[in-house]
């Protein structure tokens, strides 16, 4: 599906033209742990709402040469903004965000997808993470001094 029309053929012009679709796809990062974790060979995309499963499969196999095995789609309803949240009798919808179409694309079993690291972690962020980890360790050591403190009283009385 494309919004461009093929030009009329004129003698001497080449006939082969490639029209790319007007669709868009965006990779969504999925959690690496928990119940929402996806298998290694599954990739989550937010796609143009007009795309069908067949369009998604063709887009990925023909343009990006990916080994697509299965495509599953889901339409997520956009959030609704109400004029009054608590008055259930007279509340009216003021605004609704557009619906999103999510595609779960399963690749062949030997394919492993990892979310691309777009920006390298800066030195400040790495240093801040080290400091935070160090603070947590110190906090745990301090808590160990006071944890179960009352249990030591028996040692003094039994002497």
UniProtKB/Swiss-Prot annotation:
BP GO terms, sorted: mitochondrial translation
Subcellular location per the Swiss-Prot or TrEMBL entry: Mitochondrion
SUPFAM superfamilies: Ribosomal proteins S24e, L23 and L15e (SSF54189)
GO molecular function: structural constituent of ribosome
Keyword Ribonucleoprotein assigned: yes
Cellular component terms (Gene Ontology): mitochondrial large ribosomal subunit
Keyword line: Mitochondrion, Ribonucleoprotein, Ribosomal protein
Pfam families linked: Ribosomal_L23
Subunit text: Component of the mitochondrial ribosome large subunit (39S) which comprises a 16S rRNA and about 50 distinct proteins.
Protein family according to the UniProt entry: Belongs to the universal ribosomal protein uL23 family.
Protein name stated in the entry: Large ribosomal subunit protein uL23m
């Amino acid at each position: 599906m494309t919004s461009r029309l093929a030009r009329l053929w004129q003698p001497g012009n080449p006939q082969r033209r490639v029209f790319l679709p007007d669709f868009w796809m965006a990779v969504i990062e999925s959690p690496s742990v928990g119940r929402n974790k996806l298998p290694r060979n599954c990739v989550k995309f937010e796609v143009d709402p007009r795309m069908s499963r067949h369009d998604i499969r063709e887009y990925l196999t023909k343009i990006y040469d990916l080994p697509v095995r299965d495509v599953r789609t889901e339409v997520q309803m956009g959030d609704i903004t109400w004029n009054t949240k608590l008055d259930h009798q007279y509340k009216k919808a003021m605004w609704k965000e557009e619906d999103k179409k999510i595609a779960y694309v399963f690749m062949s079993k030997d394919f492993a997808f990892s979310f691309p690291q777009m920006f390298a972690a800066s030195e400040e962020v790495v240093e801040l993470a080290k400091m935070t980890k160090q603070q947590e360790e110190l906090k745990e050591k301090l808590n160990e001094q006071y944890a179960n403190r009352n249990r030591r009283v028996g040692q003094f009385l039994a002497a």
